[in-house]
Every structure is written in C-alpha cells, then in structure tokens.
Design a protein with these regions (language model features):
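Fungal secretory targeting signals
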Residues: 1-13
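Solvent-exposed, well-ordered loop and adjacent helix/strand elements within mature globular domains
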Residues: 11-215
C-alpha cells in the first residue's frame, strides 16, 4: 500500500505556534533616556532631562558615577538604564538606587535580559512569554520608515524581558524618545505577530551612533 506522506524522519519540523492572542498583541515601545534630552514623566508630561545636579548616581560600593538632576535620576530609575552626556551608560544594579556602568564596547546600546545580551535599536523587543533569541515577524512594522530614514522589514528579536507588562505583549526598543514620539503615530497599539525565522537587519546610521556618543 503506497502513501504520499513523507517518512517521519524526513518531515520538516513543525514550527512552534504562538498563542492566539498574538494575532492582536499589545505593542509598546521603550527607549534610553539621555541626559539633556527631552523625555516624559510617568504621567506623560513633557520634561527635559536637565537642571540642578542634586542627585548622585552611585554603584553598589557607594562610589559616585555622576551627579545628575532629579528628572534624569528618576527616568534612569524608571527605564532601568540611561545615557550620560559624557557617553557613560548606566544600568540599575542590585536595587533602584544603585547603578553599574555598562561596557559599551560589548553592549553599546545597553543590556538585554542578561549581561551578555546587548540591545539593538529597532531590532530588540522585550517579551515575557517568548524565548530569548527568538525572531518574530510584526506585520504592521514591515515597510515602516524609521526616524533615521531606514525602512523596517518587520523582523524583530527577543533580547529582553519586561517587568511591567503581561503576556502577549512586545515592547519595542526604539533607542530614543524622539523616535518613540514619531513611531507612536505610525505603529498601532495592537499588532499581528507571527513566529518566523526571519532576517534581522541593522538600522544604525552614523547619526544614530553620534546620538549614542559612539562616534
């Protein structure tokens, strides 16, 4: 008796399927607050990250990393990371009042879910229910012109975890607050996400490197 079915050993592996809620997943964005830049408070009010340097960024040993203003300090706490004008990047350490300096040679745009995972602008996403390193395709992101002029192909990679949201949500790393302000008008709050081994592209330009104090 003949059969058209392929032998089990030769069949292509089945792709892991996403939960059905990913057909209408929540899509948010996060960025690195930079000292001196415009940003916003937890309530959505516009602020500029400057002012009297009344707060001290310290490491877990009590050593001073930098003096900053109140707004900058609070944004660094809220986002868990921050960029100083002098090019130093800090990340929250053991608690909300201690910071560590990020090794920018290894992770120039910040840390992901682990110390050896670096974030990549407009590629990295945070998720609470997808595996780190997994790539997914976001339909509504495909073809979007990014603030730096490059066009996105819809492919993103899970490099981070989120502590403030639930499952079936992607938090998109857009690097800059100004990029967020532009993209929030283009990308909807709910998107269609498909599990796919897609190719992530680089969207970093010389202008982006200059903003990140990497030039």
């Amino acid at each position: 008796m003949s059969s058209s079915a392929a032998p089990l050993a030769k069949r292509a592996p089945l792709e892991k399927r996403l939960k059905s809620c990913y057909k209408h997943a929540t899509f948010t964005q996060y960025w690195i607050p930079k000292q001196g830049d415009k940003d916003m408070t937890n309530d959505g009010d516009d602020i500029t990250l400057n002012g009297p340097k009344s707060k001290t960024l310290k490491n877990k040993h009590g050593k001073t990393i930098a003096k900053v203003d109140k707004h900058t300090y609070e944004k660094f706490q809220m986002e868990g990371t921050g960029l100083l004008k002098n090019g130093k990047m800090v990340n929250l350490d053991s608690d909300k009042n201690t910071f560590l300096e990020v090794n920018r040679k290894k992770t120039p745009y910040g840390l992901g879910s682990d110390d050896h995972i670096g974030l990549e602008p407009w590629v990295s996403v945070a998720s609470n229910d997808l595996d780190v390193g997994e790539t997914v395709y976001v339909k509504e992101l495909d073809g979007v012109k990014l603030p730096d002029g490059k066009v996105h192909n819809g492919c993103v990679r899970v490099d981070d975890e989120g502590w403030s949201f639930d499952d079936c949500q992607l938090d998109f790393f857009v690097l800059q607050f100004e990029a967020y302000k532009k993209l929030e008008k283009i990308i909807p709050e709910h998107v269609t996400v498909k599990q796919k081994k897609c190719k992530v592209l680089s969207y970093v330009t010389n202008e982006v490197k200059a903003w990140a104090e990497l030039d």
